[in-house]
């Protein structure tokens, strides 16, 4: 069993899993997290107010992180292929619902299903790839996570082109349909390597849940992982507002997050190379420090040149953090329930996705500006990095 497993790791099939992962993350991110590109067309087609449109995105995000994470936990009990196929069918169902519904409730249902299917796909991809690698694990994860950045870069122009010619339903039929077909195609290939690294059949039941809830280091790692994303969701919520407050023209500020995503594509590959050489936990922690420091600098940005420099640093931080967490937690807490473990961390991340924008808004209102909020959120990011680093320390070093 071990010889068979060793022969599969770092093999041609391993890299096929990576290639499909890049494609799936590109499409999933390009559908779910480019909402701002098509939100106006969606609102016009279904008569949604600004509040209702923002609620649609909130529901999608909640489903992506919470329902997708929980689906990942449950997926540890069954073979992966039907789970992946179910996610593909879910995306197809979401596209179908959007074609026929005319109500706000129908739109919420469609995007809730889309978020759940997309989140499930995400958890499967990032938990499966590390199981197929040994020597090149960091490089493989870095390449896989380029899909996220490529989706944010490549899909917006496609959305714009399609919306100008077909409207929201037609655009969703094309992009959503391509996403569904790609996930279904991956279902024919995706499986866990024979025997897993642990040689055990994954079991997620009451005992596993109890042991997980009583594992202080896992809980510290989950808390840290949630906090270390504080900077990212603060930027998602109000980067344009932060930059324009400092005097950056709005048209320039509107392109800022795309720059972060673009830089992160190269940084994801580079971080994998660094991880294979200096250590995966050290590389991720360095990315957290860079992101937190950049957040603290952001309130003092008053010109475009330093703005671009800080955006490059954010992209470097994102490129180090995003691809490396799953191999860290799988390696530390065991690959036998890899999908479930990653699902737990994904659910934890949802808390920050919701709370960081709210905390930023409340602190900004209380302080009258962005300086204090961003400094405090930078500290929270650093605290998350420390907790995650300590919580994922090898058992011998614990």
Model-predicted segments: where are they?
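Extracytoplasmic gate region of multi-pass secondary transporters
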Residues: 35-40, 215-269
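Helix-loop-helix hairpin linking two adjacent transmembrane segments in secondary transporters
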Residues: 144-192
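Interfacial helix-cap and linker-helix signal at transmembrane-aqueous boundaries
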Residues: 42-43, 74-75, 154-166, 243-244, ...
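Helix-to-loop junctions at the C-terminal end of transmembrane segments
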Residues: 67-79, 267-279
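C-terminal ends and interior cores of transmembrane alpha-helices
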Residues: 89-102, 290-302
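C-terminal transmembrane helical hairpin of 12-TM major facilitator-type secondary transporters
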Residues: 260-264, 277-328
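Intracellular juxtamembrane helix-capping segments at the cytosolic ends
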Residues: 42, 120-133, 320-333
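Cytoplasmic helix-loop-helix junction between adjacent transmembrane helices
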Residues: 111-146
């Amino acid at each position: 069993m071990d010889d068979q497993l060793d022969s599969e790791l770092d093999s041609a099939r391993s890299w096929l899993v990576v290639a499909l992962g890049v494609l799936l993350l590109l499409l999933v991110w390009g559908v779910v997290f480019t909402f701002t590109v098509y939100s106006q067309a969606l609102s016009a087609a279904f008569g949604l107010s600004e509040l209702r449109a923002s609620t649609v995105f909130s529901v999608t995000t909640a489903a992506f992180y919470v329902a997708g994470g929980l689906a990942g936990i449950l997926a540890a009990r069954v073979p992966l292929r039907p789970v992946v196929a179910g996610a593909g069918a879910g995306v197809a169902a979401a596209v179908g619902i959007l074609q026929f519904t005319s109500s706000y409730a129908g739109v919420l249902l469609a995007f809730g299903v889309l978020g759940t299917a997309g989140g499930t796909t995400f958890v499967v991809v990032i938990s499966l790839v590390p199981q197929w690698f040994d020597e090149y694990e960091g490089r493989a994860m870095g390449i896989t996570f380029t899909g996220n950045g490529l989706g944010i870069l490549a899909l917006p122009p496609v959305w714009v082109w399609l919306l100008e010619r077909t409207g929201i339903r037609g655009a969703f039929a094309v992009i959503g349909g391509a996403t569904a077909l790609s996930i279904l195609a991956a279902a024919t290939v995706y499986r866990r390597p024979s025997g897993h690294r642990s040689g055990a059949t994954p079991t997620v039941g009451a005992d596993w849940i109890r042991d997980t809830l009583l594992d202080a280091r896992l809980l510290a790692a989950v808390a840290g992982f949630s906090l270390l994303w504080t900077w990212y969701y603060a930027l998602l919520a109000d980067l344009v507002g932060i930059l324009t407050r400092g005097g950056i023209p709005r048209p320039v500020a509107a392109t800022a997050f795309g720059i972060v995503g673009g830089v992160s594509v190269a940084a994801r590959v580079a971080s994998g190379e660094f991880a294979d050489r200096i250590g995966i936990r050290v590389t991720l922690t360095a990315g957290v420090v860079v992101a937190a420091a950049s957040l603290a600098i952001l309130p003092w940005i008053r010109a475009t040149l330093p703005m671009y420099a800080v955006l490059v640093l954010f992209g470097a931080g994102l490129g180090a953090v995003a691809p490396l967490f799953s191999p860290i937690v799988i390696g530390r807490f065991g690959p036998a329930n890899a999908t479930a473990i990653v699902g737990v961390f994904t659910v934890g991340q949802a808390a920050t996705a919701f709370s960081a924008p709210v905390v930023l808004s409340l602190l900004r209102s209380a302080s009258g500006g962005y300086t204090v909020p961003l400094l405090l959120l930078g500290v929270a990011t650093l605290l998350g990095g420390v907790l995650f680093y300590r919580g994922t320390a090898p058992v011998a070093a614990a």
